[in-house]
Amino acid sequence: MSVPTHQQDLIALLEERGFVHQCTDRDGLAAHLAAGPATAYLGFDATADSLHVGHLQGLMLMRWLQKAGHRPLLLIGGATTRIGDPSFRDSSRPILTEAQIQANIDGIARVFSRYVELHDDSLVNNAEWLDGVGYLEFLDRVGRHFSINRLLTFDAIRQRLDREHSLSFLEFGYTLLQAYDFVELSRRRGCTLQLGGADQWANIINGVELSRRQGGAQLFGLTMPLLATSDGRKMGKSAQGAVWLNAERLAPFDFWQFWRNCDDRDVGRFLALFSELPMDEVRRLGALQGAELNEAKVVLANAATALAHGEHAARSAADAARGVFADGTRDSGLPVMKLSRARLAQGLSLTDLLLEHAIQPSRSAVRRLAAGGGLRLDGTPVSDPDAPLAGEVDGLRLSLGKKQHLHLRLED
């Protein structure tokens, strides 16, 4: 892969790959990035202990920036999580405890570190400055620079009010807090670029404008398109729920399958965004038709899984998919999982089997499934999944919950 340097027009590369929706000053930002290493930040409120594939576009964008020599900052909204961003939401978020927020911060940082190299000062919590600022001080320092009339014109707020949904003053003030975050990161860390989804445009330009009004540095904003699949589903969701980026919430095998099963129309676009393949290869794979397009889907699944979970997990998931699905199915229509007699003789347990095929993320996950009655062999609940498989298992149906069923097949 050809890795750009900060002397090149990085914006053109990002546009070609589909990362750019809007820039506050496209030419100015391109020149700024070409002039030398810049510091960019991506912010998340700590509302969950992981990120999902809906966040992946931002992580990949930050990865490209770091490869080009720029410095990434991960801003966790330890303070703003208590409020909640009202952007394009119909209701308020639940209030979390401090312990929940800290656990979520730790989980998000672990996911983020798989995509960019984090240093000791790469992780920032906005509680660092927001917890210490008084209300009157904040109004004087920040509030004087904002017009209520203008805030009411922003889509995120206007649409909420147009639908006659309640918007608390707490949430209304969120955009001022995010603007203040940008200015504080500029002052404290020399940060000049904020990244975000298209729904963050108003919050980002408020930060750019606040810095200008306060006589601070010139700041830039770049937003990414809000992604949806070609069949209209919001990116980050599947029929089974959120597609999480950590193995504790979603097994690498299921993560791999999400990409392998994507709509044919999405393959080229997803390869550009979620792999690091050169664009010539992306275009070649995206142009494949019919059965050949499955090759491109496997490439996509391998690339996305390797970034999220490592090369070993990607290979294991791909091998499991070949073993489970490539052979076709028996009369029942269920996919087949193969296991060797030699491995069975060594004391193979169901836990071992599910981990080796990357179908469950951990031993504890298998045990929880069994404890809840969700792990069954031919309809009989398995109480001890760690026990060696005994008796004749060839042809038995292995069930994981209500929706996932496999046939076991012994091979020499």
From Swiss-Prot:
Its EC number is 6.1.1.1. It is found in: Cytoplasm. ATP binds at K237. GO terms for biological process: tyrosyl-tRNA aminoacylation. Catalyzes the attachment of tyrosine to tRNA(Tyr) in a two-step reaction: tyrosine is first activated by ATP to form Tyr-AMP and then transferred to the acceptor end of tRNA(Tyr). HAMAP family: Tyr_tRNA_synth_type1 (MF_02006). This is Tyrosine--tRNA ligase. The gene is tyrS.
